[in-house]
Amino acid sequence: MFLNGTAMSGGADHHLVGDAPLVARTTTAPRYRFHAVEGRYPALEDLGAAAGAAIEGEVYDMTYAQLREVLLPGEPDGLELGVVELADGSGSLAMVLRTGHEAPRTDISALAGWRAYQEGSA
């Protein structure tokens, strides 16, 4: 599972990862727009073939039970489970911007990560 928000190491929701092992610190392929939705949470938007940004995150080996029972129930309504392309071309489950979600959001793609956004907002 590719995490790019508060569940990353050091984040407020990292406890939700439990004992799942960290597989890699990596980025997505450069095909995403990265948003701060209502200033509260990050969201990846796939631009497809259009040029986007590579977004920082962490990949964890989480069980489906962990996803179903612990991580996913706490996710905001503006996100849905999807698959993202990582820098090495492989795919990973991740939370992405829900199709049709219209909440106010700010494009933070140039920052390439949620931590950088939070540091700049503090």
How would you describe each model-predicted region?
Residues 1-122:
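Glycine-aromatic micro-motifs
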